[in-house]
Amino acid sequence: METESEQNSNSTNGSSSSGGSSRPQIAQMSLYERQAVQALQALQRQPNAAQYFHQFMLQQQLSNAQLHSLAAVQQATIAASRQASSPNTSTTQQQTTTTQASINLATTSAAQLISRSQSVSSPSATTLTQSVLLGNTTSPPLNQSQAQMYLRPQLGNLLQVNRTLGRNVPLASQLILMPNGAVAAVQQEVPSAQSPGVHADADQVQNLAVRNQQASAQGPQMQGSTQKAIPPGASPVSSLSQASSQALAVAQASSGATNQSLNLSQAGGGSGNSIPGSMGPGGGGQAHGGLGQLPSSGMGGGSCPRKGTGVVQPLPAAQTVTVSQGSQTEAESAAAKKAEADGSGQQNVGMNLTRTATPAPSQTLISSATYTQIQPHSLIQQQQQIHLQQKQVVIQQQIAIHHQQQFQHRQSQLLHTATHLQLAQQQQQQQQQQQQQQQPQATTLTAPQPPQVPPTQQVPPSQSQQQAQTLVVQPMLQSSPLSLPPDAAPKPPIPIQSKPPVAPIKPPQLGAAKMSAAQQPPPHIPVQVVGTRQPGTAQAQALGLAQLAAAVPTSRGMPGTVQSGQAHLASSPPSSQAPGALQECPPTLAPGMTLAPVQGTAHVVKGGATTSSPVVAQVPAAFYMQSVHLPGKPQTLAVKRKADSEEERDDVSTLGSMLPAKASPVAESPKVMDEKSSLGEKAESVANVNANTPSSELVALTPAPSVPPPTLAMVSRQMGDSKPPQAIVKPQILTHIIEGFVIQEGAEPFPVGCSQLLKESEKPLQTGLPTGLTENQSGGPLGVDSPSAELDKKANLLKCEYCGKYAPAEQFRGSKRFCSMTCAKRYNVSCSHQFRLKRKKMKEFQEANYARVRRRGPRRSSSDIARAKIQGKCHRGQEDSSRGSDNSSYDEALSPTSPGPLSVRAGHGERDLGNPNTAPPTPELHGINPVFLSSNPSRWSVEEVYEFIASLQGCQEIAEEFRSQEIDGQALLLLKEEHLMSAMNIKLGPALKICAKINVLKET
């Protein structure tokens, strides 16, 4: 963006040096015009869009000669003003802020913008302007017809401006409906220079710069906020009232599922020489301290009103949105300018609230970039401010009437908000400035603060988070003392945040007044931050909470004067307390986290200080948690926070130890506070928790004003620690259901040890009592079974014979012996391996016996062994039937006549046989004479083979074939079914039987 802006400025300087250079720009303008027309035709035309387009055509009625001469003069004046820009900060430099890299579409005229986008050496600027026109087209709009209705007028407007290259007739303020579907109305800004005789240039064309955030480095540059200079003759009061008139808040529509379409339009005007108390009655203006600016000696009596308008747009795809506060970015850039001009060496760093750490791909930002008219020969003249203010108010009211009827209540609420938010900002910034200068040793700031401070007050450290606020902000500000309602909504406990009590918040459409019924009569000053749910990682959430912990200064033993000490700050005007304060933002939370800090601050008077400038401790008064209920993801927030709390606890505890202990006179270490919190307090807190629980939230603490703040903090912490692991939803564990088996993927690839199912079944037994206590009292939806149900479950568990794991009986199929097919197959493989070892030993034993039989004649031992083998075959059918249901695929793949499965089955038979001699021999089952079994078949002759085959049942005719084929003992053992069927023409049935008998001989 910076290089693009430099290219634009350089190309403009080069092309506008002569008056005749506007001719090639016009030739190239037609190309851009054709592109814009194509973009227009891409949208579906509607009658409303045609009428809007026709109106803009009628409003442009300057002749071509006047336009070309005006364009040439304007190019010359722009080049001159750029050459005149120097470190001596003049009003010309502030009028043409194109030298500022942080402001992309700067305060330039429409002719300047068009010439920049159409110069020969800047083709990228054309792309930039097209992106301004088209917006984020990758995300589908919520309402296509509205998107076309608001985009087409804007396209037509820019087309006409391209044709004219100048403008002297007023253009109506425009709306762009983003393709994401939110209507954003941005009010007009003051033109930088005005000729007294020309009234038509008072109205500015509002072109909303719509850009995609492509990198986090572009975050500060996304603000289209511009800087205007008021000549020394202007009065500060009028500029302040003008800024307050600019503070018209903007409501926006979102018809998506998120239910919260809120934005924050913040405008601040400040004068360089006005006192801090010179606020307008509307409170919309800011003193210069509110913007974090040092008064510039080079400015003289000039005053600089500034206005940054950030319109936040909720995305339909549950993306987080950045709150853009242009006044802060503008303050930063203006401070850098003034530092160059003054040379004072003071490093003034404004609060930049527009940095986005990780912008979403479809995240868009709407910023107002107003192209002011630079008049020829009258660059620095008096502005007609009252006229401009009236024009602005009328245009803004027209915007509200035409496009925001259904959001009138939100507009009034935000009008109230934008006024009070600046009061709170000024007060907080003043205190942060004081603490940074006067107590640098006690501060643990996350970012530098502006150093300008009055030396009257001293404030203990407070932290201000300068990260991007990736949440939609709905401020609800009322000057009143704070009540202390606690909340134990299902969020991870933040150990260093011990004193801020928290309370549940209703959804944003309920309004600011509908808080909990048990609260104190004066309501809070909460800024409700409602974030849309987005599947974020646990690391992002841990990072957000670590930043939150860093942003919350804690004093462990907060005295009981929190309620009474807060009223003087929240209700006091800024003129009595501080010139300005900067808003303390909540840190960048993960998209799934919803945090709502109270905008006011609670003050505790230390050490009996009763002077006019008391020593106060700035602490966040309350933090609100609201669980966002999106369709389809009702209750996953609590589980994620619970899962992340263990990771955050270590990081947060280290941050807590770094915080200064002298924040309050009764500060104690976290360990002491933990030891002091007793079981009685815990029980009392549990009773308070469950007394008044809303059903829409999981667990929400209701107010318990009688308990002091340290007790409340420790109670919420103990409640977070004592909550049992809720295993209902496991977002980090992928669960598969394959063929009836529930497979859960864990973090560890292959757990070694006892069964994970057994561990998970034992966990609820161990935590059964606290689970029952908490969940039964709260009546939350996430209940855990009682120990009796767990015992019943365990009674239904079966033990696998192979792996030894306990699993539910539903997982055991067939014979109920193995928990899965894998165990059944592995069991068979292991049994066959063991049987091979046994058979090898048995063969050696048989060889020895056979040698003895040859020498001494037949003995009983060898025949007993053979009978034992045969007896094992009797049980083969039972073994196979029990194994068949578990391992049918394994058995079907193997032939029953091959030696492999027979050896396996023989192994099963031998394993199942307790004593081989107990059962009588049944050789007739197999039809083999024991005489043949007692000898070695490999040494048989042809006649012995013939006798063997003839002894088999039904094979007397076939025996002759064996004799004719001269098959001896060795050939017999090598026979297969194919040999018998092909060579001897034996049918399949007898061939299979003969091969089965041969296999029995092989095994013996």
From Swiss-Prot:
Compositional bias per record (Polar residues), positions renumbered to this chain: 212-228, 319-329, 344-355
CDD domains xref list: SAM_Ph1_2_3 (cd09577)
Any Pfam family matching the protein: SAM_1
Claim: Nucleotidyltransferase is one of the keywords in the record: no
Gene3D superfamilies named among the record's database cross-references: 3.30.60.160, Transcription Factor, Ets-1
Ranges where the SAM domain occurs: 940-1004
Compositional bias of kind Gly residues: 279-303
Compositional bias segments (type: Low complexity): 1-22, 432-447, 459-482, 566-583
Biological process according to GO: cellular response to leukemia inhibitory factor; cellular response to retinoic acid; chromatin remodeling; negative regulation of DNA-templated transcription
Keyword entries, A-Z: Developmental protein, Disease variant, DNA-binding, Isopeptide bond, Metal-binding, Nucleus, Phosphoprotein, Primary microcephaly, Ubl conjugation, Zinc, Zinc-finger
Main subcellular location of this protein, as a coarse class: nucleus
Zinc finger (FCS-type): 791-825
Region entry Disordered, spans: 1-24, 212-241, 261-355, 432-512, 556-589, 636-672, 848-928
Residue positions, PTM Phosphothreonine: 922
Bias-annotated ranges (Pro residues): 448-458, 483-495
Source organism superkingdom: Eukaryota
GO cellular component assignments: nuclear body; nucleoplasm; nucleus; PcG protein complex; PRC1 complex; sex chromatin
GO function terms (MF aspect): chromatin binding; DNA binding; histone binding; zinc ion binding
Associated disorder: Microcephaly 11, primary, autosomal recessive: A form of microcephaly, a disease defined as a head circumference more than 3 standard deviations below the age-related mean. Brain weight is markedly reduced and the cerebral cortex is disproportionately small.
Something else known: The hPRC-H complex purification reported by PubMed:12167701 probably presents a mixture of different PRC1-like complexes.
PANTHER family: POLYCOMB GROUP PROTEIN (PTHR12247), POLYHOMEOTIC-LIKE PROTEIN 1 (PTHR12247:SF20)
Protein's name in the database: Polyhomeotic-like protein 1
Source species of the chain: Homo sapiens (Human)
Recorded name of the encoding gene: PHC1
